[in-house]
Amino acid sequence: MTETELFKEGLNLMFSGMGFVIIFLLILIWAIGIVSKLINTFFPEPIPVAQAKKTVTPTQSAVVDDIERLRPVIVAAIAHHRRTQGLN
């Protein structure tokens, strides 16, 4: 075989292989779409129930009170840490 014949044979093999791969991928995409539709037909996703909006409750304002109540404790803890680590 000459170089030209080998080159033609290589191109033929390359395009045949690429064609088979593209056809296989298209069939795979088609099959995945069909399986997806079948699964959604037999096992539909539940429709989410709308929940009522929550109103502001006294417990939410208690969170702010907790932060204000803990502020001196946090300041004391930072001061103690700085004192023991020699950062001051």
Curated annotation (Swiss-Prot):
Its cofactor is Na(+). It comes from Mannheimia succiniciproducens (strain KCTC 0769BP / MBEL55E). Catalyzes the decarboxylation of oxaloacetate coupled to Na(+) translocation. It comes from the Bacteria. Keywords: Cell membrane, Ion transport, Membrane, Sodium, Sodium transport, Translocase, Transmembrane, Transmembrane helix, Transport. It is a single-pass membrane protein. One of its GO terms (biological process) is sodium ion export across plasma membrane. The gene is oadG. It is found in: Cell membrane. GO terms for cellular component: plasma membrane. The keyword Lipid metabolism does not apply. The keyword Transmembrane applies. This is Probable oxaloacetate decarboxylase gamma chain. InterPro entries: Na_pump_deCOase, OadG. It is an enzyme of class 7 (translocase). Its EC number is 7.2.4.2. It catalyses: oxaloacetate + 2 Na(+)(in) + H(+) = pyruvate + 2 Na(+)(out) + CO2. The chain crosses the membrane at residues 13-35. Belongs to the OadG family. One of its GO terms (molecular function) is oxaloacetate decarboxylase activity. Heterotrimer of an alpha, a beta and a gamma subunit.
